[in-house]
């Protein structure tokens, strides 16, 4: 019974040791910090793990608090989905200067150290978007030779229709704008279901939509980008930045190809003009051809037919398509008719006399040497009749500043000829057009200024308001989903009273309304966030949480930290005026966090003048997490935000421009200086400044990592930080089989309270420590065994002599990878060599810190020789406790070695040269000459 009781007590003590305060699948490895000759600090990696099941937690709950010697460190770590902790660090990446093509994400474990820049660009590749349409252009994803679009705003509006479909030529409508050849044309979408039998639609506001599309049969094959409609899917080849050429010829097909013989054909009425009691239906036949060279030809044939006076009325008009030219924008629109309810065309609505003859025989506009990028310009062509539309449903009315001088029915005549002006990059080119003087027709250019739209805060965010410069005339609507739609589609209606057609192509680089990608990228993120402060200055809260806040920690984590130390009226009254002297005081103004010294002038301005606009957001704690390039993709959640596109093009897309791009933009790109871009990377080591702020003492320091969740509560892992000088000498010792008697039993026997250590090991290592050497205990065990291993070494005593303290450096891998490497592959030296070389990198290059090594295997000798330990200082012990030096010295034990410590390990303060001391020069055999 006594034997059974003793076994039970051993098991109880072992279980109690295993189920201690540490996480069973987590742990932390001891850290080595080396002070450099210049006073800076270098640190070994901070390997901290809490277990992979933590990956189910949200991003806002991954904050790890660090306490060093019982004092908060002032900075935090973050928990990855793998359960491993990491630091966030901002680095400057100069675009255009990287020649290696590597993006270094300072991580380890299951994550790769480096990733190719091309792979990163592929992951965050963003298709170029139209700047004047409120819909998501799908992000292409290739699968089985088809392009599968990412569901975006169109999927939301059109009821989430599938974007994958077989090659079916029964396409009702085809979207030829925003993503067509990536030409950045403005697209106005009418999402109403159209049937072939429909001849007219009432103008009740629901039909008030614009479309730049075709309704014929279409079947386009090849690699393409999808545009989704309520009834159809169009796949258009991805050809970036072609040259445009507009020609008036007798062509009656709409052809779009890149060496693919597929086309859409359309012939129909494009406009209705009411004048002097007679109605003229102006039809437009057009064709677009894309050649392999990157040129796109648009052939336009205008037709005008006289109609009876009672044949057309204002209510029979299908829709009125109005597009005004905004800075850096180009749009093309037409005036639709009742005869062609299912057609949206690209053309010009022309107004002439009752003779019905075409007003233009030929109108040729050629645009060459034109670099088209995201948001560079929009095409604008406005056409209207004299009928003013009155939508029946409630709409958002937009005010345009240039409509005051517009008079209904006004028609001014110019000379016998007019010219269309094309202005690109500050250059103007004129192409004479042949017009008939008696027709009294002119081509004019109308300007519209940016539209400022005031919206409620609960509908549009501040970022949307900042991006609003100029808006298209557009509407997104689906009759099938109108009743279930949670928000009313955006629309506008007004009569600009333009009686003539216009085509204006401009690139106004100096326009303040343009949304240039570089200008947006260069704008201060703090200034963007501060706009919300200005809009909501009345929201002011106090909290003593400055020590918990850090830049880039995330808005949700910052909110939780703020609320945990938030002050209420009672706390504020109890603290009194002394609260202003508290360094932890943080003021939350309009959702932004300020320390008191930065918030004081803002609050003073709000109280005194009722506004915070007079102050800059200086000193604000930028808690918002910096987005990665992959995060700027517009999410397919069906959001109704005004600008769902990214304004920043990826580097790979810019480099992938075809031959259609001209030499001038390429020269500008080559001459442009590299721009430094800040990005956040993961790191396993803190900065030298952060290490200096810890105020470490020489030798051992305790560190605690704390992670809290509502599900599992507070978890904590402990480790130790050792601060050494740059000229320290290190003695490395293996654990399993070297300090213990065997590899396997040495791990389990101490768990049940049985001493399984080598005789005399504590006395030997203590004597080595007393001579000024630092000890490292190296083991290939898993990180989850860190606490057990550390506790075993601390509790190991022989004849009242304990082991000296030293960092326990073990494998950062999990339990099974470590066991597989050590037991199955029998290659623990792979980890040991990498670990020792990493520690050696903490010291100056001219100083080798490793002095001697103890092990029990030949692989240990290989590891020690690899890092520069001489053979005479490598001690290999066998299971019998016999120590061999260089395999040729008399066999000794740890006890016998203790008597030779002063000769084998002379005091570090001695000035005797290492290569010629009494042990290395006289006791070791001479090297072999063979």
Curated annotation (Swiss-Prot):
Organism the protein comes from: Arabidopsis thaliana (Mouse-ear cress)
InterPro entries to which the protein is assigned, alphabetical: HAD-like_sf (IPR036412), LIPIN (IPR026058), Lipin_mid (IPR031703), Lipin_N (IPR007651), LNS2 (IPR013209), LNS2/PITP (IPR031315)
BP term (GO), one: cellular response to phosphate starvation
Tissues expressed in: Expressed in roots, leaves, stems, flowers, siliques, embryos and mature seeds.
Short name of any one Pfam family annotated for the protein: Lipin_N
Biased composition (Low complexity): 409-419
Region (C-LIP): 730-885
Protein name: Phosphatidate phosphatase PAH2
